[in-house]
Amino acid sequence: MNSKELTKEVLNLFQTLPEFYFEHFHEYGIWFPIVVGIIASAVGMFGMLLFYAAEPDTEFEKLPFFVRKIASREGDEDTYFALGIYPIIILPAEGKIIKAAAIHEFFHVLFKFPWVIFQPVTGIFMTQLPYRFFNMLTQFLYTVLPKHIVLMLILLSMPILKKFGMEKSQVYELLSLASKYITFVYICALAAVIEELLVNIATAIYFLITFKFNENTFLVTVGSSLTYLSNIPMIFACMWMDFHYADGQGVEMAKKFIELVFKTELSSLFF
């Protein structure tokens, strides 16, 4: 088999993915995660709009010192940021702050330990970008692009792994590990959602106890809760897609590619 034939066979393998999507669209119900993604994104964006609809109601200097230190980022004189993630000051020139958002971020610190563990591995779901619209877009894109991204990265690294002496059985183990890692990410993403909801509950309880539960508090707690609750159907949609497709057809495609690499000198195409 010459290089031209090898290249053609490799390309054919990679082309099976989009072909499978279109040919078996109704058979495998691939519409389900796409619809879930659209609805969940809409709910999350609505929650985000509620969050940002809250009006500044407290002078920043009047908040307790420890809350100010937590809810602001040092060295930024123009705008205060909640832990450097997203702005909670609408009118920085007047020194006004949404108190509910500041208390919300304070409770995040109480849940800091699980957040530190889970946040790095849930970036694809909970990306802390300056604007949450991009976050929802990221989630939706991942809903319709399951773990094939990881599979493709492993496949593309096959010639390199072979060159360094990795056996076929070890590559299968790597493939299995990648599948387990993605499942672990789903679990961590759910844990991060639960952590956010606990923060919102704690914030609401704080304002109820202090008899200061007003419209702003409602907008912040309900808006933030909706944003994160929308992650749950998104995550389950991804898991559903993987169980119905990626763990079957996708892994089979990966195994075919592995067989091809180890049967031929495919590495010569890359080096």
Swiss-Prot record:
Q: Name one GO cellular component term.
A: plasma membrane
Write out the annotated subcellular location.
Cell membrane
Query: What's the name of the protein?
Result: Uncharacterized protein aq_aa23
Keywords, A to Z?
Answer: Cell membrane, Membrane, Plasmid, Transmembrane, Transmembrane helix
Mind telling me which residue stretches traverse the membrane in this protein? 30-50, 189-209, 218-238
Main location, first listed in the record: membrane
What organism is the protein native to?
A: Aquifex aeolicus (strain VF5)
According to its record, how does it sit in the membrane?
Multi-pass membrane protein
